[in-house]
Amino acid sequence: MKFKSYFKSLQFSSKALLVLLQLVFIISTLSSCASDKNEERSHLVFRYNEHSNISSLDPAFARDQRNIWATNQLFNGLVQLDDALKIKPDIAKSWDIVDSTCTYYFTLRDDVYFHKNKAFGKDSTRKVTARDFEYSFNRLTDSKVASPGSWVMSNVELVKAENDSVLKILMKNSFPSFLGMLGMRYFSVVPKEAVDFYGNEFRRNPVGTGPFQFKLWEENVKLVFRKNKHYFETDTQGNRLPYLEAVAITFLPDKQSEFLQFTQGKIDFISGLDNSYKDEIITTTGQLQTKYKNSVTLSTTPFLNTEYLGFFMNTESQEIQSVALRQAINYGFDRNKMVKYLRNGMGIPAVNGFIPKGLPGFDAIEGYDYNPEKARELLAQYKTETGDNQPEISIGTNSQYLDICEYIQRELEKIGINVTIDVMPPSTLRQMKSGGELPIFRASWIADYPDAENYLSLFYSENFTPNGPNYTHYKNETFDSLYVVAQKISNIDDRKHLYTKMDSIVTAEAPVVPLFYDMAVRFVSKKVSGLGINPQNFLVLKKVKKEH
C-alpha cells in the first residue's frame, strides 16, 4: 500500500511539474511577445530627460526651458516661429496691423479643436474661438492666477473677440516686437471649462490644442504625452502631424547619468554641454569624437543667449563705480581662449557688445578684445583716481560656471586685481541678484522673443529689479531716450541703427562684462530625423520621425 501511495504521489508531482513548466513557458512567451511588441513600437516614442521637475503644465507658468519644452507639445498660440525665427501662422491664419502697430486683427482657423477631456461634458471637446484667446490672454493678468508671464500684457490695452473667428488686440503704445512676442508659450490658448473644472490642478491636467495631449505624470519620475489624432496641422504632402505616437520624459537630476542613458539608447537626444561629459563626446575643436560619429548627430546654431558678468551699479563700492576698473576687467582676460578650452569651442567670444549674433541689431561694434596692456593702463588710472592700490572684487556664481569664473580670477590677478569667488545654489544666486545683494554676479540672458530690444531692456532705467530685468540698475539718459524712440519705429532696419547705438553706449560704460554668445547644442540619435534646431532652443517634436 505504501508503494502504491508513493507511486501515485510521484505521478502527481510529475504532472504538477509538467503543468508548471508549461505555465512558465507560456508566461515567458507572452512576456517575450510583449517585449517584442514594445520593441516594435519604441520607434514611435520620443524620449528625453529633464534634470529637475517641471513645475507646471499650465502655459501661464511657462517661464523656464523645462516648462516651455513640455507645454510646447501641448498648446498652440496665434503665431509660431520657424527655425529661422520667421513669424508663421499657427491658429491665426492671417492678421492685419493698423495704426502703426497699435491695433492687430487676427483671423482664426475654423478647424482647431481642444483635446478631448471630461471638462467639456458629453461632447468631450469643442472648437477654438476668438473668445478663448480673449479669456486666455486676460487670464495672464489675473492676480489670482499670479502668472510670472503677466508682464507680456503690460503694453496691451484691450483684447476683444469681434466674433468667433476674429480677435482684436489694441496696444497702449506702439510696440513693433509684439507680433514676435506672441510666439511665446505664455500666449497659448486654454479652455475656460478646463481651467474652471480642474482649478489649481490644471497645472497637472492640461488641456490644449497641440500635436500631443496629456496622458500621465508621476512628478519627478516620468511624464507621458500621447498623439493628438485630431491635430490640425499637416506636412507638405498633406499628411496629418505628428508622426510620433508618444513623448516620454524622465527626470534624472544627474547630467552624467543622462549622458549614460543617451549612449545606451534609452533617450533620444541631449541638449547642451556639461563638463561631466563634454570631453568624452566632442574634441577640443568642437567636433564629434570618432566613436560617436556612426550613432550620433551633432547639431549647433547660435543661441540667443548672452553669458555675462553684471556689476550692481547702485553701490558705494569704489571698484564698481569706476568706469576705468570695469573696462580693465573687460580687457583683462582672453575670451577666445576661454571658449576654446572651457567650452570646447562651443560658443562665440563676446567681443562685439551685449546683443548676441543672430538677432537684428547685432553688429560688429567695437567691444573688448583681450588687451592686458590696456587693462593695466586703466588699472593705473583707477589707482590714481581713487588712491586704492589693491582693488578687490567678488563674483557670485553657481557651481556650473565655477570653471569660467576661476579662469577670469587667474587672469585678472595677473594684472593686479584681486578676485574672490562666492559659489552658491542657483536659487540663492537668482534671489541675491534680483535683490541687489551681489556687487558682481554671473548671469545669462536668453531671449524671450526674437528682437534685440529684449536684450537692451536690461539697461533701461524704468526696468530696475524687482519690477523689470535691469539687474545692474544701470541708468543713462541718452540710452533711455533712444530706447523709447525705438519702441515707436516699426521698420526693423531703422530700429537696428538705434539698437546698435544703444549697444555701443552700454559697451563703453561697461555695466556688464559680456563673456560669450552661447550656442544651442544638440546630440541626437541617428535614428531620429526631423528634429530641427533654432536660436531660441525650442523643442518642436511634431515633425520628428524615428527609425526601427
Tell me the role of every PLM-derived stretch.
Residues T129-E134, G210-P211, L241-A246, Q264, ...:
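Alpha-helical secondary-structure segments
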Residues F212, I348-Y382, Y401-D403:
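Structural transition elements
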Residues I348, A380-A447, A520:
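Ligand/substrate-recognition segments at binding pockets and active sites
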